Amino acid sequence: MQTTVEPIRGTNDPVQSLELSLVVPIFNEEQSVGPLVERVAAAMVSYPHRWELILVDDGSTDATLVNARKYVGREGLALRIVELQRNFGQTAAMQAGIDTARGRLIATMDGDLQNDPKDIPSMVSELERRELDLLVGWRKNRKDGLFLRKIPSWCANYLIGRITGVKLHDYGCSLKIYRASIIKQVKLMGEMHRFIPAWVAGVVPSSRIGEMAVTHHAREHGVSKYGISRTFRVILDLLSVMFFMRYKARPGHFFGSLGLGLGALAMLILLYLGFDKFILGNDIGTRPMLMVGVVLLLSSVQMITTGILAEMIARTYYRDDASPNYIVRQIFDDQSQA
């Protein structure tokens, strides 16, 4: 059974008074999900507004979903579980949770107990005090390995800041607070969740994006889903971010500029060879430079053609961009348990 998540409409719906939705993607966290719910519930006792917890089960193959469902319908806990059809990845799971969220503010965090939900109320207060649209957690005293996690993270944060212009200490921290009206304008894709501040900067001024030091714990159960191979994927994603940040609405400019540059170089070479052939009378048929000029000219035509096709695809994407990058199998909440 596939379920389509519909946006909440109408001002008379009681869920409109929800202040905060906490979205937590989970994958094979059977030992962590119970303590996670308990800690979130305890941390939010002092929060004075209505809130909900949304767990997104990203195709777990262990007892994660079974253990999470035990808390549905618990008194004083507004819990919704979004079960995805299969494993779509953390970015898609986060997007599913954001699409499902009904609060005015949306918080996200990991489900491995390394983020501390006690930081959420103070982060909400800080977001409002500084009038921000996005507040990013900064794991100042990070409890991870130095060589496999910390050093690659430092390098990635530096590169992302340089490329995007949004300088933060910790892009990779999942603990973030957004205004729902802003984050719902951003469509996440691929494995771009770590670059969310950069995408948000395309919607609001970077001055409305801030950070705050948060608590970070060592992992208690299971093993990290991240390894050294993830670092190489981050580099590839970073190249994609650089392209989309600069050319997402006009990709033809990128390919066109490259094509024109190659074409100009090809014309210089061919004009020189033409002068050498027809004015000076030299034989150019066996000269390698002739082949270089022809290859550059053909590459120029190919780049310009690619730019035109990219423009057509981009226009089609922005016109028809409605399909989600995930499939929901079922949603469990108070109503489904009744």
Swiss-Prot record:
UniProt keyword NAD present: no
State the UniProt keywords alphabetically. Cell membrane, Glycosyltransferase, Lipopolysaccharide biosynthesis, Membrane, Transferase, Transmembrane, Transmembrane helix
Phenotype upon knockout? Lack of Dod-P-GalA in total lipid extracts. The membranes of the rgtE mutant are unable to provide the substrate for heterologously expressed RgtA activity. Cells lacking this gene produce an LPS that is devoid of GalA. They are also more susceptible to deoxycholic acid and to the polycationic antimicrobial peptide PmxB when compared with the parent strain. Pea plants inoculated with rgtE-deficient mutant show discoloration and wilting of the early leaves.
Q: By its UniProt entry, which InterPro entries does this protein fall under?
A: Glyco_trans_2-like, Glycosyltransferase_2, Nucleotide-diphossugar_trans
Q: Which GO terms describe its molecular function?
A: glycosyltransferase activity
Membrane topology label: Multi-pass membrane protein
Record has Glycosyltransferase as a keyword = yes
GO cellular component terms, semicolon-separated: plasma membrane
The portions of this protein that span the membrane are 254-274, 289-309
SUPFAM superfamilies per UniProt = Nucleotide-diphospho-sugar transferases (SSF53448)
One GO biological-process annotation of the entry reads: lipopolysaccharide biosynthetic process
Q: Where found, per UniProt? A: Cell membrane
Uppermost EC category: transferase
What does the record give as the reaction this protein catalyses? di-trans,nona-cis-dodecaprenyl phosphate + UDP-alpha-D-galacturonate = beta-D-galacturonosyl di-trans,nona-cis-dodecaprenyl phosphate + UDP
Query: For this protein, what is the EC number?
Result: 2.4.1.-
The protein's matches in PANTHER family, at most eight in alphabetical order, are given as: UNDECAPRENYL-PHOSPHATE 4-DEOXY-4-FORMAMIDO-L-ARABINOSE TRANSFERASE, UNDECAPRENYL-PHOSPHATE 4-DEOXY-4-FORMAMIDO-L-ARABINOSE TRANSFERASE-RELATED
Primary role = Glycosyltransferase that catalyzes the synthesis of dodecaprenyl-phosphate galacturonate (Dod-P-GalA), likely from UDP-GalA and dodecaprenyl-phosphate. Dod-P-GalA is the lipid donor required for GalA transfer to lipopolysaccharide (LPS) specific residues catalyzed by the GalA transferases RgtA, RgtB, RgtC and RgtD.
State the family it belongs to: Belongs to the glycosyltransferase 2 family.
Protein name according to UniProt:
Dodecaprenyl-phosphate galacturonate synthase
The species is Rhizobium johnstonii (strain DSM 114642 / LMG 32736 / 3841)
